[in-house]
């Protein structure tokens, strides 16, 4: 079975638009990007197009590539203080001279729609998340949509970043899965994968996972974004793995669209929370 993230994201975006229109709220998202990295610029454009589609207002702030940490923090502070802005997203990676951790921690937790602030990550680990990072949360939505219940299953997460690996593991634990996190120091990755019912790969190695490394009843979620011979591909060798497993996400058209749909959901959630606080 092919898990169609594009289809599910379209469905979610339509639902979000309806909910926003019925709410009477006008959520607003601010994106901050430093430099002219083509991939980052493309991702930001996609996010703003999604905002327009679901009736979320958005502004884009582009800073020079040689911006200092202080300059980025100044921008964040201004957005934190702006009551018209409900969500703040800093497009990563930031230029080498900018302290990414300091920038993330400067965003107000209630406007941290990316879910990277230590406060929000802590709540996620505690089992009561306010905002979870968009890619892992989007994956959980995909699993739910396809009636794949992680409870009691063995899940292997490859990667330990704060944007995918670590929060993905936490969400799966919260869903009662038995979770193993693998990474560059894991001694026998294939052995771990063969035992897994659910595999989430965010390792960044093109077509690394092959059919002989997975079991026949596995669900494989490919978060990898790699370019080979000018074409986009994931961490999974789709040709060999898709013939064997129970379900798999393609690249493109799998996880990527869900990340953006989840960002819209988080932004609307932020607007609702801030509206309630204003009213009361």
From Swiss-Prot:
GO biological processes: L-histidine biosynthetic process; methionine biosynthetic process; purine nucleotide biosynthetic process; tetrahydrofolate interconversion
Role description: Catalyzes the oxidation of 5,10-methylenetetrahydrofolate to 5,10-methenyltetrahydrofolate and then the hydrolysis of 5,10-methenyltetrahydrofolate to 10-formyltetrahydrofolate.
Superkingdom of source: Archaea
Protein name: Bifunctional protein FolD
Record PROSITE patterns: THF_DHG_CYH_1, THF_DHG_CYH_2
Catalytic reactions of this protein: (6R)-5,10-methylene-5,6,7,8-tetrahydrofolate + NADP(+) = (6R)-5,10-methenyltetrahydrofolate + NADPH; (6R)-5,10-methenyltetrahydrofolate + H2O = (6R)-10-formyltetrahydrofolate + H(+)
Assigned protein family: Belongs to the tetrahydrofolate dehydrogenase/cyclohydrolase family.
Quaternary assembly: Homodimer.
Alphabetical list of CDD domains matching this protein: NAD_bind_m-THF_DH_Cyclohyd (cd01080)
Gene that produces this protein: folD
Keywords assigned: Amino-acid biosynthesis, Histidine biosynthesis, Hydrolase, Methionine biosynthesis, Multifunctional enzyme, NADP, One-carbon metabolism, Oxidoreductase, Purine biosynthesis
Pathway entry: One-carbon metabolism; tetrahydrofolate interconversion
GO CC terms in record: cytosol
Gene3D superfamilies in UniProt: Leucine Dehydrogenase, chain A, domain 1 (3.40.50.10860), NAD(P)-binding Rossmann-like Domain (3.40.50.720)
HAMAP family xref list: THF_DHG_CYH
Molecular function terms, GO-annotated: methenyltetrahydrofolate cyclohydrolase activity; methylenetetrahydrofolate dehydrogenase (NADP+) activity
Coiled coil: none
SUPFAM superfamilies: Aminoacid dehydrogenase-like, N-terminal domain (SSF53223), NAD(P)-binding Rossmann-fold domains (SSF51735)
Documented EC number(s): 1.5.1.5, 3.5.4.9
Residues that coordinate or bind NADP(+): 159-161, 184, 225
């Amino acid at each position: 079975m092919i898990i169609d993230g594009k289809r599910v994201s379209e469905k979610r975006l339509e639902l979000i638009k309806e909910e926003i229109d019925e709410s009477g709220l006008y959520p607003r998202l601010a994106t901050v990007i430093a430099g002219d990295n083509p991939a980052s610029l493309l991702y930001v454009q996609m996010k703003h197009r999604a905002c327009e589609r679901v009736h979320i207002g958005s502004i884009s702030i582009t800073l020079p590539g040689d911006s200092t940490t202080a300059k980025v923090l100044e921008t964040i502070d201004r957005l934190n203080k702006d009551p018209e802005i409900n969500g703040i997203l800093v497009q990563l990676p930031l230029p080498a001279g900018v302290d990414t951790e300091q920038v993330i921690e400067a965003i107000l937790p209630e406007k941290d729609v990316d879910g990277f602030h230590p406060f929000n990550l802590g709540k996620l680990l505690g089992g009561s998340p306010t905002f979870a990072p968009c890619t892992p949360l989007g994956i959980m939505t995909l699993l739910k949509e396809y009636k794949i219940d992680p409870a009691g299953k063995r899940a292997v997460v490859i990667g330990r970043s704060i944007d995918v690996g670590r929060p993905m593991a936490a969400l799966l634990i919260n869903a009662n899965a038995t979770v193993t996190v693998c990474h560059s120091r894991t001694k026998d990755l294939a052995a771990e994968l063969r035992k897994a019912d659910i595999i989430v790969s965010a390792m960044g190695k093109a077509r690394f996972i092959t059919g002989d490394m997975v079991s026949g009843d596995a669900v494989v979620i490919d978060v990898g974004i790699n370019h080979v011979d000018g074409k986009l591909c994931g961490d999974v060798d789709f040709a060999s793995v898709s013939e064997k497993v129970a379900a798999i996400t393609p690249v493109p058209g799998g996880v990527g669209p869900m990340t953006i749909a989840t960002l819209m959901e988080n932004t609307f959630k932020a607007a609702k929370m801030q509206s309630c606080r204003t009213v009361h």
